[in-house]
């Protein structure tokens, strides 16, 4: 049903995916489309060229008949650049509740930006994470396995690895909070002590006060 809605009766169409990542969800749709005799042009959009290269290699191996054209960049610039081709109908995917990583104003701007480039035969499918029991959401962002914690603290490891900084990751903690009134889950990295961080090439060192927080992640939940 999802594929039929996206294809909208067309055998050839361009399938854009915002924030494609590894494309694991979309591969099922693409495989099914090819099995039905359709000829989609998959156009994943991601800020990471490495991710897109890896995705392209995987799809060439798993779905060799698939047409593939990646778009690297921020959502807005990729939309402006990639949505201008009128030769095929467009279907746009924004899955995995990724829209929740934008604040309200950004989400509205993105939806409007996509809509402005869609015609009457085009389709747009967005995945939203709905509001639910606050305890359930708090557990998700403070999971016992520490997956969300490690995901956020990995930002510090990357700063050390890619910029040569001397952050002591052990001196930071991950602190998630959830506001049920706004439906907004936020993640922070908090310094547990006064500390100074040096980054090669930076004009001056970065000073952290004890319990100073850095906002690292937003996950907006939606209702009707």
PLM region spans:
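Class I SAM-dependent methyltransferase "Motif I" SAM/SAH-binding loop
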Residues: 19-24
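Short amphipathic alpha-helix with an adjacent loop that forms part of the alpha/beta core around
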Residues: 79-87
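Class I SAM-dependent methyltransferase SAM/SAH-binding core
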Residues: 30-78
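Conserved alpha-helix/loop element of class I SAM-dependent methyltransferases that forms part
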Residues: 1-13
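Residues at the N-terminus of the alpha-helix immediately C-terminal to the conserved SAM/SAH-binding loop
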Residues: 25-29
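Conserved beta-strand signature within the Rossmann-like core of class I S-adenosyl-L-methionine
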Residues: 116-131
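Substrate-binding/catalytic lobe of Class I Rossmann-like enzymes that use SAM or dcSAM, i.e.
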Residues: 130, 136-224
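A short, conserved alpha-helix within the catalytic core of class I
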Residues: 101-113
């Amino acid at each position: 049903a999802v594929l039929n809605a996206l294809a909208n009766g067309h055998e050839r169409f361009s399938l854009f995916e915002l924030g494609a990542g590894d494309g694991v969800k979309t591969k099922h749709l693409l495989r099914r489309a090819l099995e039905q005799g359709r000829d989609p042009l998959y156009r994943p959009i991601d800020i990471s060229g490495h991710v897109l290269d890896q995705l392209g290699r995987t799809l060439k191996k798993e779905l060799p008949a698939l047409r593939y054209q990646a778009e690297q960049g921020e959502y807005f610039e990729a939309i402006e650049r990639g949505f201008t081709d009128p030769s095929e109908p467009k279907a746009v995917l924004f899955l995995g509740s990724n829209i929740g990583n934008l604040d309200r104003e950004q989400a509205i701007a993105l939806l409007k930006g996509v809509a402005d480039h869609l015609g009457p035969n085009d389709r747009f499918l967005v995945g939203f994470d709905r509001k639910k029991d606050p305890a359930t959401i708090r557990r998700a962002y403070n999971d016992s396995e520490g997956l969300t914690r490690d995901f956020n603290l990995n930002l510090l490891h990357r700063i050390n690895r890619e910029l040569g900084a001397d952050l002591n990751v052990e001196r930071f903690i991950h602190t998630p909070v959830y506001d049920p009134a706004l439906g907004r889950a936020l993640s922070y990295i908090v310094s547990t002590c006064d500390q100074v961080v040096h980054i090669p090439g930076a004009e001056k060192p970065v000073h952290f006060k004890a319990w100073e927080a850095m906002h690292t992640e937003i996950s907006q939940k939606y209702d009707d």
